[in-house]
Amino acid sequence: KNITFLGEIPMMNDFERRHAIGVIEESERYEDYVMDDSAIVHQGKEGLFIITGCSHSGICNIIEYAKEVCNERKIVGVIGGFHLFKLSERLTRTIDYFQKNDIEELYPCHCVSFKAKAEIHKSIPVHEVGVGLKIEIE
């Protein structure tokens, strides 16, 4: 109940672009951009809680698409991979995006380096994620 699968994530900003993660060779050779990257959204009383995979499409693209699909502006929280590894302009702009959207709960997991988590935590509290973590969403 109140769960939405987002499907393929469109590119909605100018700082998160897909990068090929490899090359697939079948009858011909082509780059693999992981077009099947997606997320799940819980629509609760207080807003949206987003559960991501690796976020190859970009965490901000995923959040923007979730807001559009669910017709809701408030993001209560995000858990999953954010696909952020380096201290970069992309990370800086992602942190700015998180702040502008007043995201209450951030749970970066896999596909986020320690340096990136520490940089995010300077501006926004980052919750530690581990085996057995329970998050109650209403």
Model-derived regions: residue spans:
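Cap/insert and terminal regions of metallo-dependent hydrolase folds
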Residues: 33-39, 43-50, 54-130
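Residues at the C-termini of beta-strands that transition into short coil/loop
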Residues: 9, 130-131
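Active-site-proximal loop/helix segment associated with metal-binding centers of metalloenzymes
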Residues: 1-45
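Short, charged, surface-exposed secondary-structure boundary motifs
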Residues: 16, 86-88, 135-138
